[in-house]
């Protein structure tokens, strides 16, 4: 059952990276 753990970590990392990039690269949407 290691696949679930690996998938969870992968999704968590991807989500964090996506959020960081979205918040840093798109300030116009946040300001709107």
UniProtKB/Swiss-Prot annotation:
Q: Which UniProt keywords apply?
A: Membrane, Photosynthesis, Photosystem II, Thylakoid, Transmembrane, Transmembrane helix
Membrane-crossing ranges are: 3-23
What InterPro entries does its record include? PSII_PsbT, PSII_PsbT_sf
Give the membrane topology, semicolon-separated if more than one.
Single-pass membrane protein
**A Pfam family this chain is assigned to:** PsbT
GO biological process terms, semicolon-separated: photosynthesis
Highest rank taxon of the organism: Bacteria
**Cellular component GO terms, alphabetically?**
photosystem II reaction center; plasma membrane-derived thylakoid membrane
Primary location group = membrane
Please give the function described in this protein's UniProt entry. Answer: Found at the monomer-monomer interface of the photosystem II (PS II) dimer, plays a role in assembly and dimerization of PSII. PSII is a light-driven water plastoquinone oxidoreductase, using light energy to abstract electrons from H(2)O, generating a proton gradient subsequently used for ATP formation.
HAMAP family found in the cross-reference section: PSII_PsbT
Q: What do we know about how this protein assembles, alone or with others? A: PSII is composed of 1 copy each of membrane proteins PsbA, PsbB, PsbC, PsbD, PsbE, PsbF, PsbH, PsbI, PsbJ, PsbK, PsbL, PsbM, PsbT, PsbX, PsbY, PsbZ, Psb30/Ycf12, peripheral proteins PsbO, CyanoQ (PsbQ), PsbU, PsbV and a large number of cofactors. It forms dimeric complexes.
- This protein is called Photosystem II reaction center protein T
- The organism is Synechococcus sp. (strain JA-2-3B'a(2-13)) (Cyanobacteria bacterium Yellowstone B-Prime)
Q: Which gene encodes it?
A: psbT
